[in-house]
Amino acid sequence: MARVTVEDCIDKVDNRFDLVLLAAHRARMISSGSQLTIDRDNDKNPVVSLREIADQTISPEDLREELVHSLQKFVEVDEPEPDTVPLIGSAGASVDADDTEVAVERMTEEELLKGLEGLAPPEEQPEEDE
């Protein structure tokens, strides 16, 4: 069997660094049970992945997308925007989305400070060594 070299794959993937990343990702996919597209011929997974790239049985663009997807921690999902929901306190009165008037409850500074005091944790007392 002929040895797979980087020169066999470099015309499929221009950048050698990208080639190494893609071949390593494909080798990990094979290790995790992904289906082979060529015969193994007693080769190890990195060699099989390079042979797959050289023989163009797997697309480098598809590998790149799968690699990016595997590295993402949070997958962005386009969720539909929520429809306009009527307010609970409106008692059946419909509220237009174009209303710009907003009712704001005013409070004095003293009321605000009293409210904040209730939210603040109690001060810690220093511990004394005995």
Swiss-Prot record:
Stretch list, region Disordered: 109-130
Cellular component per GO? DNA-directed RNA polymerase complex
Task: Name the EC number(s).
Answer: 2.7.7.6
Q: Where on the tree of life does the source sit, at the highest rank?
A: Bacteria
Q: Catalytic activity, per the record?
A: RNA(n) + a ribonucleoside 5'-triphosphate = RNA(n+1) + diphosphate
Concerning InterPro entries, the annotation shows:
DNA-dir_RNA_pol_omega (IPR003716), Pol_omega/Rpo6/RPB6 (IPR006110), RPB6/omega-like_sf (IPR036161)
What is any one GO biological process for this UniProt entry? DNA-templated transcription
An MF annotation (GO) of this entry? DNA binding
The free-text function statement in the UniProt record for this protein reads: Promotes RNA polymerase assembly. Latches the N- and C-terminal regions of the beta' subunit thereby facilitating its interaction with the beta and alpha subunits.
State how it assembles: The RNAP catalytic core consists of 2 alpha, 1 beta, 1 beta' and 1 omega subunit. When a sigma factor is associated with the core the holoenzyme is formed, which can initiate transcription.
The entry's family comment says:
Belongs to the RNA polymerase subunit omega family.
Q: Which protein are we looking at?
A: DNA-directed RNA polymerase subunit omega
- Protein species of origin: Rhodopseudomonas palustris (strain BisA53)
